[in-house]
Amino acid sequence: MSDENLLTTLDTYLASGIHIGTQQKTEDMRRFIYRVRADGLYVLDVRKTDERLRLAAKFLSNYEPEDIMAVTRRVYSVGPLKEFGKVTGINTVAGRFVPGTLTNPSARKFAEPEVLFLSDPRVDKQALKEAIEIGIPVIGMCDTEHLTAHIDFIIPTNNKGRKSVSLMYYLIAREYMKNRGLIGEEAPFSYDQFLEKAMNVKVKMNPSNRQRGRFHRRRR
């Protein structure tokens, strides 16, 4: 496999471990699996991950940043997600997703995004449940063991590793900004910038700071 037409170099993809899955697989994710290693780990197809990343960023670029909600409960994803929100202006929820955020107009931080972006459909199940209830599209980073019946657009990736999630958020941020004409070929931020946030394991998830920004109401 060559680097031609990839969003980053193949070496960068492999070094980040985005292709390293788990020892479980589902029928939903079979089409994204390249092979199984001798130790039983399923390996994702890097080229398919790259393709889906590109398409996800293109889809998201149809939305204003305030109309997108990006969510994660995974500790190592919190820092990269916050950096993602910082560089794109996209609203983020890092840590516990308060029930009713999308469904209860009386909730203190009630929001009406037009699209939801999840780091892990299983861990972020409350956000997914509410997105299904209100009928907005869901993009999800999915590993080999995930069920994807309620995910409208799958990004197959290792969504647990620090390097892999940092690279995912960096590339989607970069492509989102490029597609919207906000940056040129050279992004004013880097993968290392996102990775540095992931390496900070002392991330504080203060309930008062978990959700940032304000949301426009969904267009009727």
Swiss-Prot record:
Tell me the keywords, alphabetical order.
Ribonucleoprotein, Ribosomal protein
| Gene3D superfamilies in UniProt | Glucose-6-phosphate isomerase like protein, domain 1 (3.40.50.10490)
Alphabetical list of SUPFAM superfamilies matching this protein: Ribosomal protein S2
A single Pfam family, by name?
A: Ribosomal_S2
**Example of a GO biological process term:** translation
> Keyword Transport: yes or no?
no
Question: Molecular function terms in GO for this entry?
Answer: structural constituent of ribosome
| Annotated GO CC locations | small ribosomal subunit
Query: NCBIfam families in the record, alphabetically?
Result: uS2_euk_arch
Q: Which family does it belong to?
A: Belongs to the universal ribosomal protein uS2 family.
| Name recorded for this polypeptide | Small ribosomal subunit protein uS2
What species is given as this protein's source?
A: Methanococcus maripaludis (strain DSM 14266 / JCM 13030 / NBRC 101832 / S2 / LL)
